């Protein structure tokens, strides 16, 4: 079965210090890897003003991860844990066609 390309974008709370943010990114990259996905690229996009307030915050750090996966197990686990983690304000997983 061919691997599918996915793009995972999530918004990190600006209340985290740099060390905590790095630990969070490494943790979620590890979740993807541990569940069978290959992380191609993981980088901060930018700190941006939010269109609307989320959890009393007006800004967030956008982080983008490009992933190759044979199935959706890793993405389902990422989705489940991102919903629980209060430091991730929002997240989105998109299957890429390119």
UniProtKB/Swiss-Prot annotation:
<keyword id="KW-0694">RNA-binding</keyword>
<dbReference type="InterPro" id="IPR000529">
    <property type="entry name" value="Ribosomal_bS6"/>
</dbReference>
<dbReference type="GO" id="GO:0006412">
    <property type="term" value="P:translation"/>
</dbReference>
<dbReference type="GO" id="GO:0070181">
    <property type="term" value="F:small ribosomal subunit rRNA binding"/>
</dbReference>
<keyword id="KW-0689">Ribosomal protein</keyword>
<dbReference type="GO" id="GO:0005840">
    <property type="term" value="C:ribosome"/>
</dbReference>
<keyword id="KW-0699">rRNA-binding</keyword>
<comment type="function">
    <text>Binds together with bS18 to 16S ribosomal RNA.</text>
</comment>
<dbReference type="GO" id="GO:0005737">
    <property type="term" value="C:cytoplasm"/>
</dbReference>
<dbReference type="GO" id="GO:0003735">
    <property type="term" value="F:structural constituent of ribosome"/>
</dbReference>
<dbReference type="Pfam" id="PF01250">
    <property type="entry name" value="Ribosomal_S6"/>
</dbReference>
<comment type="similarity">
    <text>Belongs to the bacterial ribosomal protein bS6 family.</text>
</comment>
<protein>
    <recommendedName>
        <fullName>Small ribosomal subunit protein bS6</fullName>
    </recommendedName>
</protein>
<dbReference type="GO" id="GO:1990904">
    <property type="term" value="C:ribonucleoprotein complex"/>
</dbReference>
<dbReference type="InterPro" id="IPR020814">
    <property type="entry name" value="Ribosomal_S6_plastid/chlpt"/>
</dbReference>
<dbReference type="InterPro" id="IPR035980">
    <property type="entry name" value="Ribosomal_bS6_sf"/>
</dbReference>
<dbReference type="InterPro" id="IPR014717">
    <property type="entry name" value="Transl_elong_EF1B/ribsomal_bS6"/>
</dbReference>
<keyword id="KW-0687">Ribonucleoprotein</keyword>
């Amino acid at each position: 079965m061919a691997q599918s390309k996915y793009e995972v974008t999530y918004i990190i709370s600006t209340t985290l210090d740099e060390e905590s943010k790095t630990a969070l990114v490494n943790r979620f990259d590890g979740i993807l890897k541990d569940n069978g996905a290959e992380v191609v690229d993981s980088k901060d996009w930018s700190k941006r003003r939010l269109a609307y307030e989320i959890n009393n915050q007006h800004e967030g750090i956008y982080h983008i991860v490009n992933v190759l996966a044979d199935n959706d197990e890793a993405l389902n686990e990422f989705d489940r844990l991102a919903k629980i983690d209060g430091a991730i304000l929002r997240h989105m997983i998109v299957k890429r066609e390119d």
